[in-house]
Amino acid sequence: MAPLLAAAMNHAAAHPGLRSHLVGPNNESFSRHHLPSSSPQSSKRRCNLSFTTRSARVGSQNGVQMLSPSEIPQRDWFPSDFTFGAATSAYQIEGAWNEDGKGESNWDHFCHNHPERILDGSNSDIGANSYHMYKTDVRLLKEMGMDAYRFSISWPRILPKGTKEGGINPDGIKYYRNLINLLLENGIEPYVTIFHWDVPQALEEKYGGFLDKSHKSIVEDYTYFAKVCFDNFGDKVKNWLTFNEPQTFTSFSYGTGVFAPGRCSPGLDCAYPTGNSLVEPYTAGHNILLAHAEAVDLYNKHYKRDDTRIGLAFDVMGRVPYGTSFLDKQAEERSWDINLGWFLEPVVRGDYPFSMRSLARERLPFFKDEQKEKLAGSYNMLGLNYYTSRFSKNIDISPNYSPVLNTDDAYASQEVNGPDGKPIGPPMGNPWIYMYPEGLKDLLMIMKNKYGNPPIYITENGIGDVDTKETPLPMEAALNDYKRLDYIQRHIATLKESIDLGSNVQGYFAWSLLDNFEWFAGFTERYGIVYVDRNNNCTRYMKESAKWLKEFNTAKKPSKKILTPA
C-alpha cells in the first residue's frame, strides 16, 4: 500500500467524521470527494428551545443481529461508582460563534474562509445550539439517568484574544458556570475538557498557535487559560482533561491539513500547502505536551483536592498484526507507539517511544531534563477514545521508503481486511468504523500490563450514520438506530470482561450526546444518541440507543426529580 494511503487510513480511523471520503471501506483509494456546498444560510438556522422525546418504540431491529437477553449488559454488572455518561465538545454543539463577547476560533475562521474544505460546505455557527439549549441538554441527560457529562470549554469564549492581556469574557464564565451548576443540581458530574481543538484565531495569527517555534508563548497562554478555568470552575469540577485527542488534532491540522488551520506539505491537497507534514505535527504535539505538563503542575500545586482528578484523553485505534510473521508483529508495536505512545509515554515516563525517536530522528523535538520531570506522572486518570481497530501490516524500513506524513513513521499500513480478505469486524454506518470490541479489551490490557493500570475512562465510543444530500437519512431510520445500540451494548459488555481481567476502567461516555458538526464532515454524519432536527429549530428526539441507556441507567437507581431552572 502506498505510504500516503497508509497514513490516510491511520488518520481516518482515529476519530468520528474523519472519514469516508479519505478511505473507502476496502482501503481502495485516498480521495477527497466534496459534495456541492449548501447555502450559507442552511447552516445558520436559529434553533429554538423546544424539547421532544418519542415515547413509543418505532420499527424493528432492521436486520441487526442483536445480543441475546442474557448477553445484554446490565447496570448491576458494574461497581456502584462506575460512571456512565455522554460526551460533546464546544465547537461541535454550542453555536453562538460570535455572541456575548466570544472571540473567533481557528474553526470559525477555517469554515468561513474555506467552506470547500467541509464536506457539505457547512459550519458550526449554530451547531446544535447548545449555548441556548443547555437546559434542554441537561434535561435529556437526567432523563437518561446519566451519571456524568463530558463537555469542553471554548478557549475563545473565555479569552476572546486567547491571552491574559486580552481579558476574560464574563459572559463566557457565566455560561459554563450555569451549565456546571445545573448539572450538579441534577446529580450529574461534569467532566471538563479544557481544549478540544478550538484555538483562538488571534493566537494563530500572532505566532501560529500550537506551531509556536519558541515552545513558550503557546504554553504560557494555554496555562493561563487553564488557570482561569481552575479559578472559576475548580470549586465545582472534580474531573479535568487538559487535551482531547492530541494525535488526531496534530496529524490532521498540520499533516493532512483537513483540520483547521489546514496546513500540509507542498503537493498535498489542503487549504495551505506551505507547511511540512513530516515536522509540524511533531512541533505542535511537543507544545501540547509541554502545555499539559505546566497545567497539571499548576493544578497540583494550587487546586488539587483528595477527590479531584486530572489527565488527558487519547484517541486510540486498536491494532492487530496482519499476519503471523515477526515483521507484522513489529509493525503492530510501531503502530501502537505512534497511535498511543506518542502522547502517552511522555506523561508516563517523560519521553517519546524509542521506535519514534529512532525513526523520526531530528524531526521529533527533544525534552529538557526539567520538562521530562514535569511530564512523568502528570496525571491521576486517563481518557481513551475508542471506535475501531485495524490490521497492521509491515512496510520494510529501507532507503527506498519515503514518508509523506508524520504517521508514515510507523512503517506500517493499516488494513481493514486481513490476509483472508475478511474485514476486522462488521461495518458500521460510515465506512471507517468496523465493530471490533475485542480491540477495546486489548487496549485496556495494554494499559494494565504495560502502563501500570491507571484509572481509565472510555471518554468516547460510538458510530456515525451517514446523512448527505445524495443519500439522506430519513428521521425514522435515524431514530431506529439499532446498529448503534448493538455497538454500544457490545462495547459495554466488553468493559465488564476487562474489569474481570483486572482492568482499572472506571467509566464510559457515549459519543455523542447529540448529532453535531463533525469537523470536516460537517453535518453529513450523525453520531448522537439524541437526534437533532436542524430543519425544525434543533428539536431533540431520543433515539433507540438513548432509550436503552435510560433503561440501563435507571434499572437499579431511585428516580430523582429533574431540576430545570426557568
Curated annotation (Swiss-Prot):
Effect noted on mutating E460Q = Loss of activity
What's one Pfam family the UniProt record gives for this protein? Glyco_hydro_1
Temperature notes read: Optimum temperature is 50 degrees Celsius. Loses activity when is heated at 55 degrees Celsius.
Mutation effect (I463D): Loss of activity due to impaired dimerization
- What Enzyme Commission number(s) appear in the record? 3.2.1.182, 3.2.1.21
Listed InterPro entries: Glyco_hydro_1, Glyco_hydro_1_AS, Glyco_hydro_1_N_CS, Glycoside_hydrolase_SF
Among SUPFAM superfamilies, the record links this protein to: (Trans)glycosidases (SSF51445)
Reactions it catalyzes: Hydrolysis of terminal, non-reducing beta-D-glucosyl residues with release of beta-D-glucose; DIMBOA beta-D-glucoside + H2O = DIMBOA + D-glucose; DIBOA beta-D-glucoside + H2O = DIBOA + D-glucose
What's the name of the protein? Answer: 4-hydroxy-7-methoxy-3-oxo-3,4-dihydro-2H-1,4-benzoxazin-2-yl glucoside beta-D-glucosidase 1, chloroplastic
- Which organism is this protein's natural source? Zea mays
Annotated gene: GLU1
